[in-house]
């Protein structure tokens, strides 16, 4: 690492990140109080951005023990292009649709002052295929459910009415990506008309739920967004060998099945293969895909310049774009497995594009793409390249073959050193060819620009080529070691600097603006949120409004986010980073002067007020240099160190969400229909009388059952009569007729009441209507000579009539005889003498007793 780079990193860490919440929108500042930085119009890797809004990202860690690969006589360095793939841990996501019918039975108590819900019972049922067709095309369903349980068939109808076709309408939901369509969103809880009675109301709701489902490799099960689990592979079609642990008769596949979007009802979409699964309480369907729709590998990075160091037992792929060294356990490449064929097209396309960019300096000859698996579980796609300068010398050497010397001019024997050098070169070439993962490059066709094959310069060219190759490989080894050592030191420095400001360090590593934060011993890296560059303005004043002693230590910035018209305020950080806070303040100092860099400019503030703007070149730059250390180091094959395995990390979590949801769904299916909401019943006890009466009838056996049936029959008959009367009253003709009859009865009652009142007030006039006229004639003397009888005679007549009436009543009672109750009472008196009332028929005894009683008083 150069001193210039270390110094720049230290300068970048001068401002500590203050991670606070986002501010509320502010009013734009007047133009006279702001200055527009030219960095908003420049193309830079560090635009104005906000890095405090990102909450998560990719996890990285710095290696604590990095050692560089060694270079020796047995090593071979090769340049090339490298693509790195990792396991795809992102689950396979696909759309699913759930169909269900929810039957809700509510027991309503009609109280004197208020109505109460004393019980609620809810059951869910799956939907048959003939009804799912209607729900998927015209969004209609039947509002009834027919089910058979324990040999008893029951039919539930919405609103306790008749089975009709109803429409499904969109409803709201809480989960993201979930859309529901329901036929009945309101529960039927109307109480009965009779007070102090219970009434059961039924609600049937057809529900469609569109959501997402996820499944991880090896696809033994998948989970929906709402937590429903299915113990099968989403790629199972009934014929392949995918995982299937559901009931065999619950799954079927339909071809050319059509699903219409709710907004596009009436259209004819393209058919698809769709799987249907009956879970008992709901039905699931999803588009059936092949396993090839999911790629088990994910592209991580592509390195344009990579050095492959072959050590005899392993290959080290060292890149110049980061402190990365990929080690393989073998020196022979493999063919791409069939399970990973999904990346072949991407690899070929990327390698072709990268090679076209460097083909003026490198050639690949007939080299093919080779694949390696690292000890850390990564898949490497490797394309070796050869510099064109070395390829020319190599072709000349291969085209030139030694020939026997003519007798006239025998060639002198080679010295021992030369022979050793030549044999060593051949040995290294053979070892290199045996260690290469790719097929050896065949000799190229002879060119027309070369001389004869017995060229005396052949040995010299061969020696020159071997020496050149040895020197180039040694130089590449020295460069690789020096570069690796520098990266090792930089790794240690950066690891310590991330404890101070991880955002600045990771931004310098990536070469672009990123957000980073430490999570214990690892670093989370995520993208920053760019702002609208055209709206960024700097405040000219750094003084805190309303305070004479406090000033801002960093200038204020006004900005707006992209696609947002609201203006926000923050403070300018290092490398155009904007902090969503105005907490960086200090006590105002006299004659202060600050320099703040923004793009290619530096803003100068004197006495906390913008003074001028100068060019970045106006400030001198410190130059540092680190000498290259070419000392040899031994080769070390690093093993992949994993502090905690994936299974251990899963086991360390208290909440196993997969296990919880799977167990919950298993238990929920077993107890479906048995759940009751008894909170109101327990607190108020309004149905205890009904439960107690039911237990009493059950204890009586057949007698209690007969009584219950009799009461139910009578109650049902009475309820039917009342319901019929209410239905007849609701009819227009019946209601009018009943109103007319009620009006007639009211008029009749009023007439009889008046007649009775007249009878009680003037009984003689009611019995003899002409008595008033006769009295008037008698008073005027015009009528016949009729004189009224005396009052004594009238009373005698009335007394005679009364006695006659009483005598007729006694005669009727004697003729009727004693009643049953009287005879029973008389029999009891005869059996129990103590109950008899004593009668004293003897006058003397009665007189004696009366005398004794008078004496006592």
Swiss-Prot record:
Annotated compartments: Virion membrane; Host cell membrane; Host endosome membrane; Host Golgi apparatus membrane
GO CC aspect terms: host cell endosome membrane; host cell Golgi membrane; host cell plasma membrane; membrane; viral envelope; virion membrane
Membrane topology: Single-pass type I membrane protein
Pro residues: compositionally biased ranges: 404-416
Residue numbers on the Intravirion membrane side: 754-857
UniProt-listed SUPFAM superfamilies: Viral glycoprotein ectodomain-like (SSF161008)
Site annotation Cleavage: residues: 432-433
Stretches for region Disordered: 398-452, 832-857
Ranges where the record places region Hydrophobic membrane proximal region: 678-730, 709-729
Alphabetical GO biological process terms: symbiont entry into host cell; virion attachment to host cell
Subunit and partners: Homotrimer; disulfide-linked. Binds to heparan sulfate proteoglycans. Interacts with gH/gL heterodimer.
Protein name: Envelope glycoprotein B
Lineage, uppermost ranks: Viruses, Duplodnaviria, Heunggongvirae, Peploviricota, Herviviricetes
């Amino acid at each position: 690492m150069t001193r210039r780079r270390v110094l720049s990193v230290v300068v970048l860490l001068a401002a500590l990140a203050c991670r606070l919440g986002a501010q509320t929108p502010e009013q734009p500042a007047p133009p006279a109080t702001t200055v527009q930085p030219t960095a908003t119009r420049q193309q830079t890797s560090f635009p104005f951005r906000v890095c405090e809004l990102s909450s998560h990202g990719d996890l990285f860690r710095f290696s604590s023990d990095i050692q560089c690969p060694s270079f020796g006589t047995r090593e071979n360095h090769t340049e090339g292009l490298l693509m790195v793939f990792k396991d795809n841990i992102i689950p396979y996501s696909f759309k699913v649709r759930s169909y269900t019918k929810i039957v809700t039975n509510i027991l309503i108590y009609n109280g004197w002052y208020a109505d109460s819900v004393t019980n609620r019972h809810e059951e869910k049922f799956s939907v048959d295929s003939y009804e799912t067709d209607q729900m998927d095309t015209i969004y209609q369903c039947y509002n009834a459910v027919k089910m058979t349980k324990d040999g008893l068939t029951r039919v539930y109808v919405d609103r306790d009415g008749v089975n009709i076709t109803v429409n499904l309408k969109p409803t709201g939901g809480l989960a993201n990506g979930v859309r529901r369509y329901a036929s009945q969103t309101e529960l039927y809880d109307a109480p009965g008309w009779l007070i102090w009675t219970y009434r059961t109301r039924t609600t049937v709701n057809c529900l469609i739920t569109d959501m997402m489902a996820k499944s991880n490799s090896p696809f033994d099960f998948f989970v929906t967004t709402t937590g429903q689990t299915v113990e099968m592979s989403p790629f199972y079609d009934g014929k392949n060998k995918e995982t299937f642990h559901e009931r065999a008769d619950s799954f079927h596949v339909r071809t050319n099945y059509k699903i219409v979007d709710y907004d596009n009802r009436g259209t004819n979409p393209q058919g698809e293969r769709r799987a249907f699964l009956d879970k008992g309480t709901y039905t699931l369907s999803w588009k059936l895909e092949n396993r090839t729709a999911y790629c088990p590998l994910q592209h991580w990075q592509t390195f344009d310049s990579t050095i492959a160091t072959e050590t005899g037992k392993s290959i080290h792929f060292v890149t110049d774009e980061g402190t990365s060294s990929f080690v393989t356990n073998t020196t022979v490449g493999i063919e791409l497995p069939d399970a990973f064929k999904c990346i072949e097209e991407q690899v070929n396309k990327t390698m072709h594009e990268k090679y076209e960019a460097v083909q003026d300096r490198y050639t690949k000859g007939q080299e093919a793409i080779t694949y390696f698996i690292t000890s850390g579980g990564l898949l490497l796609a490797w394309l070796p390249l050869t510099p064109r300068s070395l390829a020319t010398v190599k072709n000349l050497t291969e085209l030139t073959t030694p020939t026997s010397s003519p007798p006239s001019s025998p060639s002198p024997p080679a010295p021992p050193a030369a022979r050793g050098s030549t044999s060593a070169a051949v040995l290294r070439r053979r070892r290199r060819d045996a260690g290469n993962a790719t097929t050896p490059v065949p000799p190229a066709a002879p060119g027309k620009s070369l001389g004869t094959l017995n060229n005396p310069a052949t040995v010299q060219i061969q020696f020159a080529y071997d020496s050149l190759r040895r020197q180039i490989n040694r130089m590449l080894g020295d460069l690789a070691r020096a570069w690796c050592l520098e990266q090792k030191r930089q790794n240690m420095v950066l690891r310590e600097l991330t404890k101070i400001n991880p955002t600045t360090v990771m931004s310098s590593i990536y070469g672009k603006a990123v957000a980073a934060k430490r999570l214990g011993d690892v670093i989370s890296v995520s993208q920053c949120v760019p702002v609208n560059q055209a709206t960024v303005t700097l405040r000219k004043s750094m003084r805190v409004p309303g305070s004479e002693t406090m000033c801002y230590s960093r200038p204020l910035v006004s900005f707006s986010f992209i696609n947002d018209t609201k203006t926000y305020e923050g403070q300018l950080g290092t490398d155009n980073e904007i902090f969503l806070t105005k907490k960086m303040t200090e006590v105002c100092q006299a004659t202060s002067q600050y320099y703040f860099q923004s793009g290619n400019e530096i803003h100068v503030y004197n006495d906390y007020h913008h003074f001028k703007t100068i060019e970045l070149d106006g400030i001198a730059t410190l130059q540092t240099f680190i000498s290259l250390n070419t000392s040899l180091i031994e080769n070390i094959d690093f093993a992949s160190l994993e502090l905690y395995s994936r299974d251990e990390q899963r086991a360390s979590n208290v909440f196993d969400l997969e296990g919880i949801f799977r167990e919950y769904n298993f238990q929920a299916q077993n107890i479906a229909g048995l759940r009751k909401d008894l909170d109101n019943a327990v607190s108020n006890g309004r149905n205890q009388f009904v439960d107690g009466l039911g237990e009493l009838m059950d204890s009586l056996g057949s007698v209690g059952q007969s009584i219950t049936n009799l009461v139910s029959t009578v109650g049902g008959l009475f309820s039917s009569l009342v319901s019929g009367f209410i239905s007849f009253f609701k009819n227009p003709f019946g209601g009018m007729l009943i109103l007319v009859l009620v009006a007639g009865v009211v008029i009749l009652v009023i007439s009889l009441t008046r007649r009775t009142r007249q009878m009680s007030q003037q009984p003689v006039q009611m019995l003899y209507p002409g008595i008033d006229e006769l009295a008037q004639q008698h008073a005027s003397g015009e009528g016949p000579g009729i004189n009224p009888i005396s009052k004594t005679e009238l009373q005698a007549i009335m007394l005679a009539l009364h006695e006659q009436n009483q005598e007729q009543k006694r005669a009727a009672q004697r003729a009727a005889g004693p009643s049953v109750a009287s005879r029973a009472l008389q029999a009891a008196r005869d059996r129990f003498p103590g109950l008899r009332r004593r009668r004293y028929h003897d006058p003397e005894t009665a007189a004696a007793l009366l005398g004794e009683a008078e004496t006592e008083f």
